[in-house]
Regions:
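Extended substrate/RNA-proximal surfaces in nucleic-acid metabolism proteins
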Residues: 1-96
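Charged catalytic cores and adjacent phosphate/nucleic-acid-binding surfaces used
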Residues: 5-11, 20-21, 75-176
Length: 176
């Protein structure tokens, strides 16, 4: 569930006037980045992402594993090797049985990679974390945008299958 929905009473809402947490992809308010610095934002994001993986809420897919890359072209690119954090995320997703969404949103928003970035997707592949695909479409014209290229990208990162959800709640693994 999203912040503020049933079962998530303890989840901080970043969009309230009294919130001190902010949000990492709000381009109207960069105080989180300015206060914590790039490394601090990354570390907090990875910790929170792993806590979400470990949640007892009923969901299967973790999306935007490296949304933290959103402002990399605006002066907030990591000045450190993120691989240890990526490995932590891959281990957490694997150990909790979560799938990861490969999203076409990043290239659509002008970034040079996908969500997750190539290095992180390779870590997920190495850890045998299942994947599914999405486009994070907020408009009809973006549904399945660049999806074939995203599938080829996943193949290049080591994946040979991806999972498709069914209305029954079951998942089907299919070849790339």
């Amino acid at each position: 569930g999203a912040a503020g929905t049933a079962g998530t009473e303890d989840v901080a809402r970043p969009d309230t006037p009294d919130s001190l947490c902010g949000w990492i992809d709000d381009d109207t308010n960069l105080h989180v980045w300015e206060n914590l610095g790039v490394r601090g934002v990354w570390e907090r994001y990875v910790d929170d992402w792993c806590r979400a993986c470990e949640s007892s809420l009923n969901f299967d897919v973790m999306a935007h594993p490296d949304l933290v890359m959103r402002f990399s072209k605006e002066g907030f690119a990591p000045d450190f090797d993120p691989e240890p954090l990526w490995e932590q995320m891959a281990e957490c997703a694997h150990d909790t049985g979560r799938r990861v969404e490969v999203s076409t949103a990043a290239p659509r928003k002008g970034l040079d990679d996908y969500y997750p970035a190539t290095g992180l997707l390779r870590c997920f592949a190495h850890a045998e974390v299942p994947i599914t695909f999405g486009s994070d479409a907020h408009r009809a014209c973006d549904i399945c945008w660049n999806i074939r290229e995203a599938q080829a990208h996943a193949y290049d990162c080591g994946y040979r299958t991806f999972d498709i959800p069914h209305a029954t709640g079951e998942w089907e693994s299919t070849p790339l």
